Amino acid sequence: MKTIKIWSLLCVILLVSGCKQNNWLDWKTQNELFLMQNAQREGIITTPTGLQYECIFPGLATSARPDNAKMVEIKYHGELINGYQFDSKDSYIGYVNHFVPGFCEGLKKMNEFGIFKFYIPYDLGYGNQGNGTEGTASHIPPYSTLIFYVELKDVI
């Protein structure tokens, strides 16, 4: 009898974990399709790494540009392809190389006072692990494309 209960419990666990894995694979596919369609939009630039971005306002061409050794002050909000906003700051100061790779790459393309929108594929973001605790406001599921609206206020 104990063996049957253990096997039953094991089967339920496998079924639940399999469903969750399928959900992540469906989410991955949705994100990949989003990026493929987004790349066709007018004004979208795709880099060799797969980062997509659009320039909303170019900023000052004569101003300093970010690099890994510099700090920046930015205003941003981040969301997923389904519109879920996971983060937003009116003012954030940090080193360029402390962001996820896609965000870092995008910042380096900006001029001071520029406004860009980044579309960061999961492999340049939080990868197949995601970020944060599931069920919390800041949770980012595995395989998520990150969409950031970024204003570069200052290069420090």
Where are each of the predicted segments found?
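Sec-dependent bacterial lipoprotein signal peptides
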Residues: M1-S17
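Cross-family detector of peptidyl-prolyl cis-trans isomerase
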Residues: K5-W7, C19-I156
